[in-house]
């Protein structure tokens, strides 16, 4: 266990897979990339080790429960947008509130069309020193990614959450990623799913990936992170969006 909810989801999921394999006496395998279709391996694409607290949440309201967290969907989305350094500016505007849907609460507004994203001043790693300009550059992007994905914001103890379908919609509507799609793992076999994953990664497209823990509530229920490469053995590079903690290669055909 760690305090990283995305990694904890993976631990629970792999535990279920191993338990089932033992019960059914089934060998545990990892699906490997098909060299006829995909690159044999794809080196890790992301160089960022971003998280959800300062300076990433610097521009979010500071409430009685503490400063609101960016949310894992926003952190994952921001890291992918930063990888592409795109767009230069967004489209339109949108406003959310904290508490969610309470128009008398704190307004969290993103004016996408009037914002030029300061890609040049976004650091890969904010665990050391950084300037106000570097902090504001990444905090603006994080706020916009949250608002675009209809984030339900919460403080440090409750967490912030959003649905993956809203993330895809936000990428299309506010950031101009017209081909962004929301795919559901249950609609595909393991081989079909990993063929999609390897295909996108092999093409240089990091994936915003979501996991849901059955029976969990609150911050531990759903998690978003980034898949950004794979090795020849079929293990996939995961950036958990937790300040670089436990980033590495994992079996994700779960």
Please give the residue ranges for each predicted region:
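Short secondary-structure boundary/capping segments
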Residues: 87, 226-227, 245, 252-254
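Catalytic Cys-His active-site segments of thiol-dependent hydrolases/isopeptidases
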Residues: 1, 233-253
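Active-site-adjacent structural segments surrounding the nucleophilic cysteine of cysteine proteases
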Residues: 2-160, 231
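Predominant activation on well-ordered alpha-helical scaffold segments within soluble catalytic domains
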Residues: 78-81, 168, 172
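Active-site-adjacent substructure of cysteine-protease-like catalytic cores
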Residues: 169, 173-239
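Active-site-proximal structural scaffolding
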Residues: 65, 70-74, 163-164, 190, ...
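Short, solvent-exposed coil/turn linker segments
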Residues: 118, 163, 184, 245-253
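Subunit-assembly interface segments of extracellular/virion macromolecular structures
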Residues: 88, 161-170, 176
């Amino acid at each position: 266990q760690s305090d990283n909810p995305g990694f904890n989801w993976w631990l629970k999921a792999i535990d279920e897979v191993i338990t089932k394999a033992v019960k059914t006496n089934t060998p545990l395998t990892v699906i490997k990339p098909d060299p006829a279709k995909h690159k044999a391996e794809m080196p890790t694409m992301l160089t960022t080790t971003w998280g959800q607290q300062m300076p990433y949440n610097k521009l979010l309201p500071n409430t009685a429960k503490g400063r609101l967290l960016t949310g894992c969907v926003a952190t994952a989305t921001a890291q992918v947008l930063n990888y592409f350094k795109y767009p230069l500016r967004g489209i339109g505007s949108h406003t959310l509130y904290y508490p969610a849907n309470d128009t008398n609460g704190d307004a969290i507004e993103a004016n996408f069309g009037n914002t030029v994203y300061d890609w040049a001043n976004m650091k890969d790693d904010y665990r050391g020193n950084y300037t106000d300009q570097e902090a504001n550059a990444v905090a603006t992007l994080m706020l916009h990614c949250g608002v675009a994905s209809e984030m339900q914001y919460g403080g440090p103890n409750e967490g912030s959450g959003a649905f993956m379908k809203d993330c895809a919609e936000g990428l299309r509507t506010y950031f101009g990623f017209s081909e962004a799609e929301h795919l559901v793992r249950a609609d595909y076999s393991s081989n079909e799913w990993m063929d999609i994953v390897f295909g996108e990664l092999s093409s240089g497209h990091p994936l915003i990936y979501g996991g849901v823990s059955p029976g969990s509530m609150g911050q531990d229920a759903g998690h978003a992170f980034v898949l950004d490469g794979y090795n020849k053995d079929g293990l996939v590079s995961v950036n958990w969006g937790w300040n670089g903690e436990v980033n590495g290669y994992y079996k994700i055909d779960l």
